[in-house]
Amino acid sequence: MSRKQLALFEPVLLVQALTDAVKKLSPRAQWRNPVMFVVWAGSVLATLLTLAMVTGQIAGSALFTGVISLWLWFTVLFANFAEALAEGRSKAQANSLKGVKKTAFARRLRAPRHDAQADNVPAAELRKGDIVLVKAGDIIPCDGEVIEGGASVDESAITGESAPVIRESGGDFASVTGGRAVEAAGDVDVLLLDKTGTITLGNRQASDFIPARGVDERTLADAAQLASLADETPEGRSIVILAKQRFNLRERDVQSLHATFVPFTAQSRMSGINIDNRMIRKGSVDAIRRHVESNGGHFPADVEQNVENVARLGATPLVVVEGARVLGVIALKDIVKGGIKERFAQLRKMGIKTVMITGDNRLTAAAIAAEAGVDDFLAEATPEAKLALIRQYQAEGRLVAMTGDGTNDAPALAQADVAVAMNSGTQAAKEAGNMVDLDSNPTKLIEVVHIGKQMLMTRGSLTTFSIANDVAKYFAIIPAAFAATYPQLNALNVMGLHSPNSAILSAVIFNALIIIFLIPLALKGVSYKPLSASAMLRRNLWIYGLGGLVVPFIGIKVIDVLLTLLDLA
């Protein structure tokens, strides 16, 4: 199902919003908004006064009072319309999905087997516990859990993302789990970004074997391949493939070798294999050094130099060891994403500090950080180091945002002010974060910050305009309205409004019309450009502060001239 993009003023939504705006004129609906309730009460009072003047019960200009009451009602109606239109736009997508459910049919299985007999039933009749079979080209009939199989699913109607995503057994997804998460993102001034997949393409590949002195390259490649046989990461598979390409070392099966695979952990930071009496490990430099020294060995100086050379080129060095003997270095090469440096420059203009988080050593991290243009980096990062770094920034009064996908990221995600967990990550990470990226794209954190900034800018701009607008309105109408009582105020009547009645009526009409003109701005949002806080403040004050002062003077004067020409005041 494709996602229908809503126009700013969809005809169907406009009609519904007008209907809802009239319904909201009831006292019960108005009571929920104290400010508009005061205007509503004034409208009722002005209407009663108009009726009293028409019937001759009290003296006064029924025309003037009637026009005032009419525009007060318009003010309430326009405010209701703006609220109803915003609500209608947010509900439109959900209603379209409900419409799909009413017309969609599902294959409900009679038994929990994919080959069981199925009944075609309307999606609306599905209940909790039903098992549904979905085939290629089908609409997903309802929300549920995938218990068997997998598929590429178009979720654009829900997420707005056009690219299909993989949904399979054991997967799950959520969206924003913390209500103020996006708003908080607008105040973020430190971004912690994982190197792999965010700053780099995330497909590190083994590019070279660099043996230690006295070790031939084939011996190193053989040991590296054995240590990677059960390693299902892209890096591990690339090591196996490189050894096969270079030395025709065929891939072997761990079980047939009667070997024990030692998986990677965030604490050990190495993996490997135990086979016969051989104990082979590959991992980060510091982890292998500790391993060698704990087994009574010595870390060779030539390997240290090779590690440094690999790191200076921006590649990641992995060291291979058998027992306490260091065999050499594997170089893993990744590529920095195109355009990422420019994006970091924009964030810097906004006053946001970017910090790259990586398990690489300091030399590799420094090389990639310089290439990518980040402000700082945390090398050889452990879960404890990430958590400590976040707490350090928060102690300095900063708001921190980060991404993560693993169980070891959960403590840091829980500590961060804005935490975006990857949908492809573990359940612990998703529960710790206050947002989940359905597309598992860590770069989305930058987009979240942009959206948060735009929300804050829109709110601030409208508030600035509103305050300046009110100041200008009162400065414009008070001298004219009270000049007869206090002649000294004529000196402040710089606009030369025709009469006190004209001044009041012009202000009331302008107040109603400005609501309509501000609706597109409120719905679409203020256009956002990466600027520093001071530059952004100056820009808003010039556009919305000065604009809020100038627009009422011009608008009220134009309305005053029209009222005078029409002899309505």
From Swiss-Prot:
Its EC number is 7.2.2.6. Gene3D superfamilies: Calcium-transporting ATPase, cytoplasmic domain N (3.40.1110.10), Calcium-transporting ATPase, cytoplasmic transduction domain A (2.70.150.10), Calcium-transporting ATPase, transmembrane domain (1.20.1110.10), HAD superfamily/HAD-like (3.40.50.1000). The lineage of its organism: Bacteria, Pseudomonadati, Pseudomonadota, Gammaproteobacteria, Enterobacterales. This is Putative potassium-transporting ATPase ATP-binding subunit. It comes from Salmonella typhi. PROSITE patterns: ATPASE_E1_E2 (PS00154). One of its GO terms (molecular function) is magnesium ion binding. It is a multi-pass membrane protein. Keywords: ATP-binding, Cell inner membrane, Cell membrane, Ion transport, Magnesium, Membrane, Metal-binding, Nucleotide-binding, Phosphoprotein, Potassium, Potassium transport, Translocase, Transmembrane, Transmembrane helix, Transport. It is found in: Cell inner membrane.
